[in-house]
Structures are given as C-alpha cells and as structure tokens.
C-alpha cells in the first residue's frame, strides 16, 4: 500500500455507520475509536463542541476500532453499544457512546459487565438483552467489520480521523484547531 493509499478512507460511509448530521454535509468526519482508549475519551470531550459549532455543515461518523491488546474491555463495550443501537435506535447508540466515555474509569478494568449493563439500561436498552447479546457475541462480527475497514485504511491507533476521506493527523485536541482543519478541508 502506498503512503497515499494509507491516507485514504478505503470504506465508504453507508447507512450501516453510526452518524450525526446530514448525509449531504460538505464535511464528513470519520473517527475510528476505541471506547476504552483514554485518548478517544479526550477526543470525546472536544467532538461535541466541534459538532455544535459546525452544525449542518458536518456529518460525524463513528466506527469501532477496539485495540484489545491494550484495552481488554473495549470489544465488550463496542458490542454492548451495538446491542443498545439494535434495541433502542441510533439516539440510544449515541447516548451509550457518551455514557461509556463519561464513565470509562468505572468499567475499563472491571472483571464483569455489570457497569456496562447499567449504562446500557441508562441509554434505554434492556440490560438482560444486552447481556445475552454479549454472551452470544451477537455483534462481534459487526465490530470486527468496522475494525477491518480501519485496517484497510491504514488505521493502527486510536483515535484516527478522516476528513472527507483523507486521513487527518493534525491537532484535534482543541475545538478551534479541529474546526479550522475541518473548515479548510471543506474549502
């Protein structure tokens, strides 16, 4: 794979993806994230303000990229988020996404799914159904598809961002710097 290809999003955004914002927005931001990653949690603190500032000019897409070697509960969290989405819809997915990041220290080192299931209930899902889905690995393949789409795009860490299909390795740590990069991509 050439350097140019590694900097390109190889899997197009589809209805399968979790998205906020209009499909025809001039800016599409795709994040490959790990729900247990502390850097992704930091990005989560910036992204809602970026989304608010850009409004309908931005479509934000989240794809799972659990790095289980470093974050052993990341896959479980991603599968739980998918179970919540299947049960309660896209808004519930985003609530679960937010809750998992906001409460990350409470579940990241847990030996069981108790706290993740409590968060699933808070997000609007039936925790017994989420538990059964986790037990059967019902959404593992979905999460792995996200992961492999990241691998094909050259993702090797999280968070990794793509702006309008091009990898963004700039400063995402402040709202102003991230918005400036996004607006530049749209011009």
What are these regions (language model features)?
Residues 19-20, 107, 168:
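Short clusters of hydrophobic/aromatic residues that line enzyme substrate/ligand-binding pockets
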